[in-house]
Amino acid sequence: MKTHQKIIPTLWIPLTGILTVNLLLNACAQTTLKDAFKKDFLVGGALNQAAFTGQNATAAAIARAQFDTISPENDLKWEHIHPQPDQYDFSAADQFVEFGQKNGMFIVGHTLIWHWQTPKWVFQDDQGKPVSRDVLLTRMHNHISTVVGRYKGKIGAWDVVNEALNEDGSLRDSPWKKIIGEDYLLKAYQFAHEADPQAELYYNDYTLENASKRAGAIALIKKLQSQGVHIAGVGLQGHYKMDWPSPAVLSETIEAFSAAGVKVMITELDMDVLPAATWSQAAEVSMNFKLQAKLNPYTKGLPDNVQQTLAKRYADLFTVLVQHRDTVSRVTFWGVTDGDSWLNNWPVRGRTAYPLLFNRDGSPKPAFNAVIQTSKEPQTPQKPM
């Protein structure tokens, strides 16, 4: 407490600095997320550059006070860290890792192999034509060995492959698959393990709660396991709706992956309270819909009744997660405050979204208190309906 008290008399602190100090002091006085669930699983957030560099003092303060694990929102993705064939830019990633280390956090690397946010040059030659299998494998190996090797012993786990499946559970026909073949996944995990044998390796995807895609993911994991790959866990991204998935379906999903021999993480958690722009539950980044007033109804704030519904939805979710604490190892929110959320600009750019536990000013929402409360209640396993 003394370190915080020394800051208070500094009268020239800007408004954001005052808010940060208040957040830090409040965090000392109330139960934090990481303390509430310390016997259950890690709790964290995805940080953007403004958060881990301190430019967004509010987000940085919340992260320090509330989280014991962090993921980078964008700064370890290929287009950011390896924009040109002979150019790596580790400046932001190094700061992210330093932030995590200074605050004693478990650091997750996101992501090594994805079909989005990967530069075109990775898949093309100088004439813009697709490269050969051998060339792409070499580029994959060099990238993974360089990035994972740089943070060996610092980043504890990696989302090695992200979003490799279609909604029916089949392999997505990505450039990786088209050029290398289905064994691109095997190679990616082998290269990552070679670069850091101690790091945990994960598969990460959205809508794994849906039966067909879940079955495809389990089949993929079992195939890789049979080939000698040790996948430590699967990431359910957790871009959830107010009516999807049900607690029973989430419970069923966790149990299915547990039976496959992997632990489960919720890796990109948010809860969209806004009207759906599409029937799809998929968090497909390519989706883009025109801004309409009916899709953006809460520009002046979230009504109390919606706040309470959101709080109950989060409480129901965390009740299931705590019930499955033996399988669930981590819950990571995709952002820190509502103002940080990607849902302000996806799938409709320019909306006012409210998907997280903290308001734009950094104050906790009713959903925060509802989540904390679930850690204090007796839990009994929930049977799938």
Predicted regions: what is each one?
Residues 65, 69-83, 92-209, 275:
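Substrate-binding cleft and catalytic face of glycoside hydrolase catalytic domains
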Residues 46-57, 78-91, 165-170, 207-216, ...:
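Acidic-and-aromatic substrate-binding clefts and catalytic sites of carbohydrate-active enzymes
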Residues 30-69, 73:
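Boundary/entry segment of secreted carbohydrate-active catalytic domains
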Residues 117-121, 129, 150, 159-182, ...:
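Aromatic-rich peripheral "rim/lid" segments of glycoside hydrolase catalytic domains that contact
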Residues 12-26:
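Bacterial N-terminal signal peptides
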Residues 40-44, 69-71, 106-108, 155-159, ...:
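Structural preference for beta-strand elements that scaffold enzyme active sites
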Residues 50-65, 138-147, 213-224, 314-320:
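Short, acidic/polar
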Residues 2-15:
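Bacterial N-terminal signal peptides that target proteins for export
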